[in-house]
Amino acid sequence: MIPHDTKKPQINPRRLVLEGRENELYQLDCETGYVPAESNFSDFCESLKSGRAWLVSGTRGSGKTAFPEAVASGCNLTTCIVAGRDGLKQEEILYDWDKEEQATWMREHLETAKTLPDSEKGDFLAKARREKWKRDFLILGEMGLAYDLAASATKLPETAAPPILILDESDKFGASVEDAMLMPLERGLVYVPRLQGGYIGVADWNSRPIVVTTSNDLRHKLSAPFVSRHVYSRFNTPSLVKELEILRSRCPQATPAQVAFAAKLLDAVRGIAGLEDYPSLRESIDVLNAFERDRLARLDEVNLLRYFCYFVKSGEAQELLKLQIDYLLLVANAFHPIVDMWLAERDAKWKMTLMNSGRVFKTESEFVLETSEF
C-alpha cells in the first residue's frame, strides 16, 4: 500500500464525475504530467460512474499503469497494488490468518483457564476460541485492504476518498487468482469464513475502491467471468501529436530542440522493418529525460550511440540499427512537418528557427543548436 499524503486534502474522482465535473478530473491528471487519450479517459469516467472495475489492455509502455498512478497522485488517493507474477497466492491478495498470533492467544488463555474454577473454564475457553477469529488476527492482502479502506472512507464521506486498487499485469495471475477476485469485483465484499461479522468491504457501487486492471495480453487469456466484471478499454500506441503532448507534459523543462530530437528519432526507429520489439511511449519519455539531463544541443553519431541503451534493448536490434545510423541522424535532424510545426505553434523561438532555416533542415551541420538559444 502507498498511503496518501495526510497533510493534503483528498479529492474523490468518482464524485467529480458523478457531479459532471469530468474536466476537473482531466486537468488533475494532466497536472501530474500524464495526458490521457480522450477515449480512454471517457471509458475511465464510465467505470467511475458505474462502480465497475476498469480493464485496460495494450502494449507495454503505453501508459496503462501510469494512468491510475496519475489519478492517485492528482487526487491524493491511497494506492493498493497487486502485481501479477507466477506463484501468486490468494492469501497474498485477499486475506490470511495470523496463525502464530492465534496459537499464542490460545496458549495464554489455556494457561489462564488452569487458574479458574472448573465451572468457569468451559465458557472462558469457548469465548477464547471464538475470539481467535476476530479482526485483530486477520492479515489483509492488497485487494482485501483496498476494499476495507473503501468501507472506512464511507464513515467520512466529505473528507475521505476510496483508494485506487491497481491489478497490474493481470494476464500473469492465473485462473485460481482470477476466480478468487470474482466475488469482490462483483459484490464489493470479501467473505471471510469464521470472521466475526463475516466479511470486509462495501457493497455500495459508489463507495467501492477504484479498481484498474491492466493486461499486456502476453501470458494467458483472461477468463470470461473475470472480464465481464469490468468496463474495457484498449490503449493503442498514441499518435505522434499525442506523443508530443505527453512528452511536453512529462518533461516541461526540455528544450524544443530536445523534444524534436526525441520525437523524430523514436518515430524513425518505429518505421524500420525487422525489429522484434519497437520502442514505446515509455522509451520516448526516458530518452527525452536523458536529453534534458545532459543538456543535449546536437545529435551526432557519438551522442546517438550513447543513448541507444534507452530504446534498443536486444543485441540483434542494436546491430540492425547501427546499420541505420545515417538514416536515423538524417531524420532526427531534418524538418518534420508534424513535429516542427507543432512545436512552432507553441514556441516563438522554434518558429523563428524554422523561418530562418527555410523550414527545412537538410544536414546535421545545419542543425547545431546552442543550449542558450532555448
Segments (PLM) and residue ranges:
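C-terminal regulatory/interaction module of P-loop NTP-utilizing enzymes
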Residues: 1-374
